[in-house]
Amino acid sequence: MFGMGFFEILVVLIVAIIFLGPEKFPQAVVDIVKFFRAVKKTLNDAKDTLDKEINIEEIKKETLEYQKLFENKVESLKGVKIEELEDAKVTAENEIKSIQDLMQDYKRSLETNTIPNHLNEEVSNEEALNKEVSSDESPKEVQLTTDNNAKEHDKEKEHV
């Protein structure tokens, strides 16, 4: 048990019987057995607690791994959203630039009383049609079409 053989245990028992006497010896043996059982139970409880703690540490490590994985996924999703927002921003900036170009074109045309560049093609087509129509129509009708064109141009000025 404690590195003692049978003969050594027998010597200890004989000394205990002589020292305690035959009346107190049985109670002392019961107390010693209870003490060793309590120590054994305490050691087993400590072992179980240690095993639980080790298991908790493993669970903590696993939880941290999942947390890191989750954070990485969230960051990757943020990256995707940011890229999509950047694309939308670039598209919006391009649209704003084209609208600003149109506004500048209108302002220049208003200052010089000419037709905006982007409308030149449309107007040249309309003028060609008007010339064809004007040869067949009377001067009064040609005057009406030019008045309508002037009204449309005035409406465009109001929107700007």
Curated annotation (Swiss-Prot):
Signal peptide: none
One GO-annotated biological process of the protein: protein transport by the Tat complex
Ranges for region Disordered: 118-160
UniProt-recorded name of the protein: Sec-independent protein translocase protein TatB
UniProt subunit comment: The Tat system comprises two distinct complexes: a TatABC complex, containing multiple copies of TatA, TatB and TatC subunits, and a separate TatA complex, containing only TatA subunits. Substrates initially bind to the TatABC complex, which probably triggers association of the separate TatA complex to form the active translocon.
Regions of compositional bias (Basic and acidic residues) in chain numbering: 128-140, 149-160
Transmembrane stretches, start-end: 1-21
Record key words, sorted: Cell inner membrane, Cell membrane, Membrane, Protein transport, Translocation, Transmembrane, Transmembrane helix, Transport
InterPro entries: TatB
One GO MF term attached to the UniProt entry: protein transmembrane transporter activity
GO cellular component terms given for this protein: TAT protein transport complex
Coiled-coil zones: none
Organism name: Helicobacter pylori (strain J99 / ATCC 700824) (Campylobacter pylori J99)
Location(s) in or outside the cell: Cell inner membrane
Function per UniProt: Part of the twin-arginine translocation (Tat) system that transports large folded proteins containing a characteristic twin-arginine motif in their signal peptide across membranes. Together with TatC, TatB is part of a receptor directly interacting with Tat signal peptides. TatB may form an oligomeric binding site that transiently accommodates folded Tat precursor proteins before their translocation.
Family stated for the protein in its record: Belongs to the TatB family.
HAMAP family in the record: TatB (MF_00237)
Topology of this chain in the membrane: Single-pass membrane protein
